[in-house]
Amino acid sequence: LLHMSENSSHPLNILSASEISDAVSVLKKFNKDHENSSFSYISLNEPDKKLLKENSDLERIVKIVGVDKKSNGFEAEINISKKELLTEEKISNKAGPTYTLAEIFGAIELTMKDENYQKALEKRGIKDLSLVQIDPWPGGGFVNKNIKNGNRALRAISFLKDSVKDNAYARPIQGLIAHVDLTEKKVVEIEDHGVVKVPEATARYDKDGQETLR
């Protein structure tokens, strides 16, 4: 391993913005399928201590973990000093990359637009969707029967705000879970265990939400 990147003065320096951009560009150049991939982890592969002790002029190797347009998880190593893709492997279905913000917000949008979800809210007397907060959680453990093996999934729970500025976590919409298949980009089931009254108390602690302050 030779040749230090021009963006770094020491082999253990964190990646610069330009190095991260270079790594992504190299990945997309060598594999066109990554044109629309999302990345959950990009970091420097630190060199072996022995090698570092013997030579401070080392190549910079970047590890990227992400999800491609087919929702397959992958790991790749890129030599940004030589602008080469060293390795790329698909991640086993038994594991998966961290959820990306795009997936999380995508799950929220899919849930909010789902007709059965909206009907479940109406059954609870909830009609103003702007006051509903949806929180997607990992879909592992007991995987919904309608989600194919290997597909990426989230399960979403909901909370109801009494105003736009309210702390929604004080008012859970209980007994309602949306199972979202991220790979198929659809809600596969709305799990409804019956109506439970939403707590009425507010949880706002700003001056407008409290009559008196301690």
Language-model segment annotations:
Residues S5-K70:
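N-terminal-proximal low-complexity accessory segments that begin disordered
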Residues L1-H3:
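Short, Lys/Arg-enriched N-terminal segments with co-localized hydrophobic residues
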Residues K53-E59, K82, K145-R152:
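Short, ordered beta-strand-loop transition motifs
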Residues S92-K94, Y99-R214:
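Extended, regular secondary-structure scaffolds
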Residues H34-E35, S71-F74, K83-T87, Q118-K119, ...:
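Short loop/beta submotifs within extracellular cysteine-rich repeat domains
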Residues K63-S92, F159, G175-D181:
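Amphipathic N-proximal alpha-helical interface segments
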Residues A23-L27, E59-G66, F74-A76, A107-E115, ...:
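Short, structured motif recognition centered on aromatic/hydrophobic residues
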Residues S5-V26, E89-K113:
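N-terminal trafficking/processing presequences and adjacent post-cleavage segments
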